[in-house]
Amino acid sequence: MKKVIKVLLSSIFCLSTLAGCSSSPYTKAEAQTLTIQGVPVYVEPDEETTQEDIDTFLKAIKAQPEFLKKNCTGIHLQGENAFINYAQQNFGDKYNKTFGYTIGEDVFLKTNLNVNGSKRDIDSVKDTVAHELWHVFDYANGNDEYYLSEFDFNILYNQNPGSISEYGATNVLEFFAEAGTMYLLSPEELKEKNMDVYNYFESLPKE
């Protein structure tokens, strides 16, 4: 069976005008279920989650291409306490400090925007949402035993594992997600770092 992957994620900026929200950005978020381009999005706040937090993540999700979202069966936007409690139930304490992870084709994100005294911006959140969705893509396009990245792409990883990022060098799954995110958000940078990897992502089906 495939291994469960758990990965990093983050948050950002207010979507109030786009979402039709006229209330204060500090208004507490309420639990609800939304659909974005066919993907169920479950808002699971705690007492500290603001509507600004949620609107930021919704904006980042909407910005992702449809081909990357089509295999995703659900995105859970969780307040920090809800995120930690769920992670502990499933994985113990190991993932308490992460900002997100995936289980199969579901994505779980911690919606806390403030990290170590600073606030994450929209670009940071788009980056991490894309990273998680590439893990879903990797999982969904593999088979019962292996992720997609564990086939031909594994050769590219082994040739130069540190070419994309320090985190990407961890293993082929992270290399794939980091490279895919760069392909979407900074394609020229990916070309400079590893043209063969860029060409691989260029050849992937995107329908």
Q: What residue spans do the PLM features occupy?
A:
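Active-site scaffold of zinc-dependent metalloenzymes
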Residues: 81-128, 136-140
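Auxiliary, metal-adjacent structural segments of Zn-dependent hydrolase domains
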Residues: 37-105
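Bacterial N-terminal signal peptides
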Residues: 10-17
